[in-house]
Amino acid sequence: MKQSRVAPKRTLLTSALLLALSQPLYAQQTTNTTNTSEAGQRSATVDEDARTLDTVVVQGIRGSLTSSMNLKRDSQGVVDGIVAEDIGKFPDTNLAESLQRISGVSIDRSLGEGARVTVRGIGPDYNMVMLNGRQMPASSNGNGAGVSNSRAFDFANLASEAISSVEVYKTSRASIPPGGIGATINIRTARPLESEPVINVGMKAVHDTSNGNLPDSLQGHDITPEISGIFSQRYFDGTFGVALTGSYQERDFGFSQVGVPNGWRPFRGDENNWGTIPQPGTPGSENITNRPGPTDIYSVPQNLNYSVNGVQRQRTNGQLTLQWAPADNVTTTLDYTYSENKIQQQRNELSVWFNFGPSVSSWTDGPVAAPLIYKEIINPANSDVSMGGMRLANVNENKSLGFNVDWEISDALDLSLDYHNSSAETRPDSPWGSAGVLGMSAFVRGDTTADFTRDFPVVTIALPPGVSQVEPSQALVSGSVFNNAYNKSEIEQTQVKGRFEFGEYSGLDFGASYTDVENRTAFGFMQRDTWGGVGTAADYDDSIFTPDNMGEYFESFSGHNAPAFTDRFLLFDFDRLRARAAELTGHPEWYRAPEAFTRDLRTEEKSTGGYMQYTTTFNWSMPLNLAAGVRYEKTEVTSSALVPTATGISWSAANELNLNFGEPGFATLRGEYDYWLPNLDASLDITDSIILRGSYSQTIGRPGWADIQGGRTLDQIVRVDGGTGTQGDPSLKPLVSDNFDLSFEWYFAESSYVSVGYFRKDIENYIGTSQIIDVGGSDGETPFNLHTPVGGGYWNAALANGCPQADVVCIRNYILGNFNGQPGVTRTGTDANGNATGTINGLSSDPLASFRITTPANKQDSTLDGWEFNVQHVFGETGFGVAANYTIVDSPDLNYDNAVLGGQFALVGLSDSANLVLFYEKYDWSVRTAYNWRDQFLSAVFDGSGIPNPNYVDDYGQLDISIGYQINDQMSVQFEGINITDETVRVFGRNERQTLFATQNGPRYMLGFRYQF
């Protein structure tokens, strides 16, 4: 579609700069001509007014940085981006690794590489990801132990080879589908009619050093292949084009991890409950050094776990694009994009569980204290040394089929139609389910000491007399769990867009859209709590087990070889051990995942929207560009959940009533919301090289899938005063953000600029929790309409015969003693205290039970703001250049208070970040080093056991390098290194000594070539 024009003198200057750098590269061609084939695809991009140059073609590091600079310079609002040569020239495992070089963008890593992005302190769930202007679905099941309810797109599924550019829209506009509060990220792929014909192929050898830092049984191949290819051709006088891209990568790697995965239990210093350390003056208090004060907060570890993990991944990407221009003013595009990411993970562990018995401990100072030494006394030495193992296998599959028609009706009017159907699916890829865990133990553990004085915790285990180390002859299977996790998200979207030109510098953009999103998460599991063991150790062949030492796999951490470290553990053959446990129990079904789901959440969102946006340029001495628009969006939510169906209430103990459950069934809830979302962008060209920019917009971020799930889940135990349960709320409002941006940009030299930007987001409707009290009555309803004997006819008879209202023992004795055999009453005997035993069921004539239902609710409003600093400079013709940025993000009222117990609202992902890129490109050589840094940030507000506790990711910096050489016009070679300084990742709790996870990954190196035919 036609582009909004800017002042001619700026266009001519920019064109002159870029034309001086132009060299052929198929992916970078951009144009402002009215050629039909090019107009046909511009409507598929979000930024319809960013490119104002005449046929500019760039290549290399310098050229690609210049293209990124001019994307920023010529855009409406605040936009940053990366072009394909920039991505292709850099050692990026995926797009997330590339995006982190943009100011304000930080990444969350999974399995050693970028997975999800945070923009300006706004987490992955609230950043919209699109492919060629189309909203993309997302799916994941995390580590296989459960389903994901996140909307966040996983960039690890996509290779970077086929991408022409990535655009990050930090300010919104009316034409962008809503959903991105932090940013909207648009991934653009190659189009044959706007690209020079090309055929090339590339191959790489990948060596991940972490693979060699694993036990032999967990290792993959030291060298794995990666291959990619591009075919793009035009036919029939340039009216028909075909582009085919594909890539395949195998990666074998590993990581070693130590931590407290089941979390830390927090207490006040004056508490005296299970898990607390002894109070002053009580038995055991003499074993405490520097005891936390009565108002201090302290935490004790639930366990300590070491693991070695071998991972194999096979990633396949492909895209086929067909374009046809049947007339000079019509272009049609049909494209299909496919990605498959298969992941297999094997894990072996050494762990100890703390039962909070007698202990010896020493502590840091308060007010938030952590143990330096925590020793649990176990005598005799017959507790378990746990050495479990896991096998995980999942496949992530993404498909997208799209069709686009662009019609230039006249010089003043363009229209386009775009439709796509896309899906993202994550499913098990093993006959044993998405993840299977076998507990294996040796019951030889005595006094157990955990030393948390260093980043690497060290465990010391006292073994029984005559036992010097763990042996295969002591090992047997204990507990187990096999999971079946499934997630699928589908999007069907139709967009109609148009632009009417009023004159040389003014126009009206308009459009409408319909989007149907269906998301399903389902989960089932088979768990055996046989923690005392399955059979005896003598029932297992010693050849199943292989002794090893855990410390040698943590060489990047100080303390891994401490003499006090009891690091002996047993590896085992997972398949043989699983088969033996199934044989011993006679129940093979206990050791595989069930096919049926016990939890199944299905949600559909139907959104309709429309927008108008007016753009104009006042060509004064200082040209002023304005864009003002508004978008209307209405969303209807229907959510169904498979939940256990409660059928009745039985009073079986003095203060406890139990729910009776039948077959599970689907329950459905509905909701809707609508918003008018305005935007205003202004940019003032103070000089040909200086721009002052300001923007305002309102955006929304939709609630997570779990928050809007249908159906109510009731807890099995009901008290005399009522029951409890949980439910989602499809009528939840989205987060609403008023966004303000102001920036100064100075393009002071060729390929060089400096910019400073301030941003502020006033966000309302943050989601917390509240309780709904459902009280039964003659004309009311409660969950499942359950009748309780409390307050019923039998109950009232007991009160009438002298039982006090609060004496439930008296009431039960009276009912069971006087109404045995009557409807709902069955007496089974008398207990040791002389009280009647039996059950009293609720009758239809009894009152309806009341339930306190915990549900998500819009509860919090807050503000965050920050600064972005960018500098990019090329040092003349020397070949040297630098690009750097720094981002500051702050929100004082959204921080976590470590000295407060219980649930808190805090913004996760909020952190400063910085990037530095140094490069040299001349005489066929290109060398680049990049350092990416992210400050400490809060990643979660609950720990591994679901306890309200903060999770902080320590600050992290990574150094990468790329060296390329152009042999001739057809052949180039490249060497790449990622994390070459072998940085580690650490997560901790309320105190830095409360290690949650410390992970060693390792450097990765790649050597490859690319040949262009």
Locate predicted features.
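Surface-exposed extracellular loop regions of Gram-negative outer-membrane beta-barrel proteins
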Residues: 135, 518, 567-572, 576-581, ...
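Outer-membrane beta-barrel translocator/receptor signature
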Residues: 145-153, 161-168, 175-186, 192-288, ...
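C-terminal beta-signal and adjacent terminal beta-strands/loops
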Residues: 763-765, 932-943, 964-1013
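Flexible glycine-rich, low-complexity coil/linker segments exposed to the extracellular/periplasmic environment
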Residues: 271-301, 364-383, 445-477, 535-597, ...
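Gram-negative outer-membrane beta-barrel transporters
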Residues: 762, 767-772, 778-942, 981
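N-terminal periplasmic "start-of-domain" segments of outer-membrane beta-barrel proteins
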Residues: 57-90, 116, 127, 139-147
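Extracytoplasmic beta-strand/coil segments of soluble accessory domains associated
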Residues: 96-140, 170-172
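Outer-membrane beta-barrel transmembrane strands
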Residues: 183, 189, 220-234, 247-249, ...
